[in-house]
Amino acid sequence: MSFSRRAKVTKSDIVNQISLNIKNSNEKLEKKYIRLVVDAFFEELKNSLCLNNVIEFRSFGTFELRKRKGRQNARNPQTGEYVNVDDHHVAYFRPGKDLKERVWGIKG
């Protein structure tokens, strides 16, 4: 599989695609309800990460917080000014086996 250009997929695109998938299954669910579920999902994901929980979706991947060590003399790329950066946490995603296998052969 090869791509000429990367497309950006937004939350609205995901809601629209879910809506199409539901319509194809002959079920009815309005987009506003799908959006509520998607919004609640992302909010819960953020809340769980803020509680330092590990969020695992089998075959898809795992979200977790990782501690990034602070450092001195980091450079602000916009101003060129040197600043100190404190220890902080960052969100990290580790893809699952099925996701890794699925995207392995993608070129471009």
From Swiss-Prot:
Alphabetical keyword list: DNA condensation, DNA-binding
Q: Which Gene3D superfamilies match?
A: IHF-like DNA-binding proteins (4.10.520.10)
Q: Which GO terms describe its molecular function?
A: DNA binding; structural constituent of chromatin
Tell me the Pfam families matching this sequence: Bac_DNA_binding (PF00216)
Q: Which SMART domains match?
A: BHL (SM00411)
**Similarity comment:** Belongs to the bacterial histone-like protein family.
Under which name does UniProt file this protein?
DNA-binding protein HBbu
